[in-house]
Regions:
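Gly/Ala-rich beta-loop-alpha elbow adjacent to hydrolase catalytic centers
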Residues: 61-66, 70
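Flexible "cap/lid" loop of the alpha/beta hydrolase fold
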Residues: 75-111, 144-154
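Conserved HGGG/HGGXW glycine-rich cap/lid loop of the alpha/beta-hydrolase fold
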Residues: 2-43
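Catalytic histidine-centered segment of alpha/beta-hydrolase-like enzymes
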Residues: 193-206
Length: 218
């Protein structure tokens, strides 16, 4: 049997290296990481079309906006989806509540054109990341993704096997938002976890991602 293929997608303001510790902690399988191009050219690793080889599952793993991007864009087929601090929609509206008020994103977008570095750094700090954004910030792609974060609604795309990994102390995606957005799907809660579980609890994430993947082939 061939081990699973894990495809990781980072969130808004981050880069593929965000996943390094989780990928290193996975006990089995192969992993690749999508680059949404926030600090350089975007890159989507080649994912074989059609069904995977017998016994091999494809598991998509998205953090925060990365989970929304996967659901909205569907860039490849997967057998299971893991949403880490993730959601199928970010802003309130159309019966989706509690969630982030749309005006919060409106303010970020209004400021972004004039001060992309500042807006990005402020958001990263709110997430719990004190390090400044890396060099090479790409305002056009970050700005487009910020508008997507405000406008996209991928609830109808959330079908099939899925697992949520959530932080009970997440200031960006609070527990009440996770519970209503992902009701009906298995959710693993990290009691001290905030919004950056792949950085603060990589082993915890890897263990649960691997167990979810193993369950897909049973």
């Amino acid at each position: 049997m061939t081990g699973p293929l894990f495809v990781f997608v980072h969130g808004w303001g981050f880069s593929p290296g965000f996943w390094d510790a989780v990928r290193d902690a996975l006990p089995d399988g192969e992993s690749v990481a999508v680059d949404l191009g926030f600090y350089g050219p975007p890159s989507l690793p080649h994912i074989p079309a059609g069904r995977p080889p017998a016994g091999r599952s494809v598991v998509a793993v998205g953090h925060s906006f990365g989970a929304l991007w996967l659901l909205h864009e569907r860039p490849f087929a997967w057998d299971g989806l893991v949403l880490v601090n993730g959601f199928p929609r970010f802003t309130e509206g159309d019966g989706f509540a509690p969630a982030t008020p749309r005006r919060v994103l409106d303010r970020m977008i209004a400021r972004f054109d004039a001060a992309p570095q500042t807006v990005t750094a402020d958001f990263l700090r709110r997430c719990g990341c004190e390090a400044p954004p890396p060099d090479g910030l790409e305002p056009a792609r970050l700005g487009e993704a910020l508008r997507a974060l405000r406008d996209w609604d991928a609830r109808d795309a959330l079908t099939g096997p899925a697992l949520a990994l959530a932080g009970a102390q997440d200031p960006i995606v609070p527990p009440a938002m996770t519970e209503q957005a992902l009701s009906g799907f298995d959710t693993a809660w990290h009691p001290e976890g905030e919004h950056l579980l792949p950085l603060t609890a990589p082993g915890w994430c890897a263990e649960r991602i691997a167990a979810f993947a193993a369950g897909l082939t049973k």
